[in-house]
UniProtKB/Swiss-Prot annotation:
Species in which this protein is naturally found: Acetivibrio thermocellus (strain ATCC 27405 / DSM 1237 / JCM 9322 / NBRC 103400 / NCIMB 10682 / NRRL B-4536 / VPI 7372)
Biological processes per GO annotation: cellulose catabolic process
Name of the protein in its database record: Thermostable beta-glucosidase B
GO MF, one example: beta-glucosidase activity
EC number(s) on file: 3.2.1.21
Amino acid sequence: MAVDIKKIIKQMTLEEKAGLCSGLDFWHTKPVERLGIPSIMMTDGPHGLRKQREDAEIADINNSVPATCFPSAAGLACSWDRELVERVGAALGEECQAENVSILLGPGANIKRSPLCGRNFEYFSEDPYLSSELAASHIKGVQSQGVGACLKHFAANNQEHRRMTVDTIVDERTLREIYFASFENAVKKARPWVVMCAYNKLNGEYCSENRYLLTEVLKNEWMHDGFVVSDWGAVNDRVSGLDAGLDLEMPTSHGITDKKIVEAVKSGKLSENILNRAVERILKVIFMALENKKENAQYDKDAHHRLARQAAAESMVLLKNEDDVLPLKKSGTIALIGAFVKKPRYQGSGSSHITPTRLDDIYEEIKKAGGDKVNLVYSEGYRLENDGIDEELINEAKKAASSSDVAVVFAGLPDEYESEGFDRTHMSIPENQNRLIEAVAEVQSNIVVVLLNGSPVEMPWIDKVKSVLEAYLGGQALGGALADVLFGEVNPSGKLAETFPVKLSHNPSYLNFPGEDDRVEYKEGLFVGYRYYDTKGIEPLFPFGHGLSYTKFEYSDISVDKKDVSDNSIINVSVKVKNVGKMAGKEIVQLYVKDVKSSVRRPEKELKGFEKVFLNPGEEKTVTFTLDKRAFAYYNTQIKDWHVESGEFLILIGRSSRDIVLKESVRVNSTVKIRKRFTVNSAVEDVMSDSSAAAVLGPVLKEITDALQIDMDNAHDMMAANIKNMPLRSLVGYSQGRLSEEMLEELVDKINNVE
């Protein structure tokens, strides 16, 4: 960087430095013209640029300049395609350059704790590994164009209900393994210019003033060297926030918090060094944006629309396909049923709402793809304005379906059902849509349901339809992408990035979402999504990682290059995948790891690798994965680090979390010995489970139990069970004078210091 930032900071007044730490207006940073510090613009959003027009009111979020509306993250994640996500990110970066936007507010890497979260359509997955990998690709793509990405919302912002005030209570291990992990790899791997803190409190402190979150973890551990920005209006106490690591407040405070910062520095409440560090981080990004600015930048709208079409097609998930009803034949009569045909839901509502450069017409795209030999019949079926059942529309739909070879029913969630700002209260689609599907099933056996929704829904009619294609919110090229997949021009290759439960009550957060008053406790802990369903043995409607194809794939020959390794070693895993069908296609190979026996609670299995591979009919390829320590580790709160327990681990290769086709066993040996610290209140059983400690306590315990004639080897002896469960201090009373309190203290000290 040609600019000497430290020199500039020395030339800045205290007031200028404080002023740089809050916005100029809703979207810009403050300039300092006398020192050559420009103002830069940041704006939404994750799946398309939402730059509000200059004449638009702040609340008029739908009045923005035209931009390409790509599939939302919920859909794009189902592509499991790092390269595709990076290409979408690069396209977003190009559009930012064309509109003089320096920072794009996205991607969102929040975990899908509950299917009810109203903003889930903006997030990638329930799994932190998948989420962080795709977020990293998105960031790399955006920043490849000289535009900064803003990773958000850090952290534990997993609901819209009271999101600005709710206190999210999460234990440390769950934070590390689930909610932090979704951000960690993205920060370390892709180095986003900006990270946005969330609105909520985390374990009692607002994220905007949480030092542990913003400084200790994000900046010191993960080495984030950009700046931290508040979510819009998330600042509670500006001085405390700055001290904790919140560099930039957005939007403008109209000078109010600038004065508070100045007063805090003058009074000694806030160190000027902390202010200087925040200014340095902000200036670094501002000048990076300035250096990378492309004058008179333009982008190819048609090329971006084609990319949006490809991204949507590659993200669609074929959930069910009995009798190979899909792909559709390019002949005969096809009934297209549902108001979504004419007025599709292709994006979510809220701050990510895009004004598209163009919008495909689903009916026209299917008509064009089908050709002259296809006769299309359209029937509205239901009204989008309300959920009321219109029998006249249903009868018209039945008539259209009965006279057709196949009926394609478009269903899903209207805008009013899911949006930023509020959560759903159920997983149902509108009752008029459910009734329509049931009615069509009475007269037509070949039914395809196309779902347009941002998160999982219940499907009470699932056994009455032959095919279900999950299209999520597919962006402006949804129509063309649907035509490609329905007619087989594109072989569906998407797989679910989240579990579809049979019903809401099966979800692990069911009893604790959205919490009570201003507090929500994550009592399910680590067991989010498939980690819960698979461990609990609950059969989902469609499991995590599930997705069908128009072709068939076979797996064989799993191998590992090492079977017995230390935890700091690298293990390479390879597996062969062959296309044994008649159509070219892509398969997503998933690798899970299972700890066979652990002293701590762990999920049944966890995703630790995935690769998407293209195969022509008859073609076979070898897919290779590399596993390091983190693939086998859990977060140990005693040592405040990732730890692997010595033992056997299973490496599982699957088509989904529930369809495991190959497995191999490896032994991983820990290089870190963790010694528990015992006290007089430690249970006898816990001490005896440690071999070194047992060698010290064992003889003393045997002397006491022999005198009491207690058989400690008899698992059904009540007194033996009591002895095992009692604290060491209770042995004094049972010892009949053999063990004093002073002797016990010496014994505990010896136990803790034994080699």
